[in-house]
Design a protein with these regions (language model features):
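Conserved nucleotide-sugar donor-binding catalytic segment
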Residues: 2-4, 8-97
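C-terminal, non-catalytic tails of nucleotide-sugar-dependent glycosyltransferases
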Residues: 65, 88-128
Length: 128
């Protein structure tokens, strides 16, 4: 992440999170991703905050685990006009054994309803 385009902070190599669909995004923003021609599934225009993680989930469901480069190659600029910086009501939290993150309750309910089949087992087709 960077605020000035020069200095970086919170550097982290991307990785898949077991709670990705619920907003535990350790991959980064969509600008950190690339897709083979003809594979991109588009974004759900009913959500703002979870728009990227929901896309990553659908892509994995259809195409399998993405290839992830274990290196810091991109710095996202942080600024006050980011979608996640304003215009989203963070009114709920989700926790697992190691982290807690903020979410929008209406969006997470949309996710739980839209992907209810996934939440039965929390398994992807590429997992045994």
């Amino acid at each position: 992440h960077t605020t000035d385009g020069v200095e970086t902070h919170r550097d982290c190599a991307p990785k898949w999170s077991s709670r990705m669909l619920e907003g535990d995004n350790l991959l980064g923003s969509p600008s950190c991703t690339a897709y083979l021609n003809g594979t991109y599934l588009g974004m759900d225009d009913q959500i703002k905050l979870l728009i990227d993680t929901e896309l990553y989930h659908r892509m994995r469901m259809k195409h399998g685990m993405p290839f992830i480069l274990d290196d810091v190659l991109i710095a996202n600029r942080e600024h006050n006009n980011r979608v996640s910086a304003g215009g989203v009501d963070y009114d709920a939290t989700i926790s697992d054994s190691s982290r807690t993150w903020l979410v929008n309750k209406a969006e997470i309910e949309h996710i739980y309803k839209k992907h209810s089949d996934y939440f039965v087992t929390r398994k992807y087709p590429d997992e045994t």
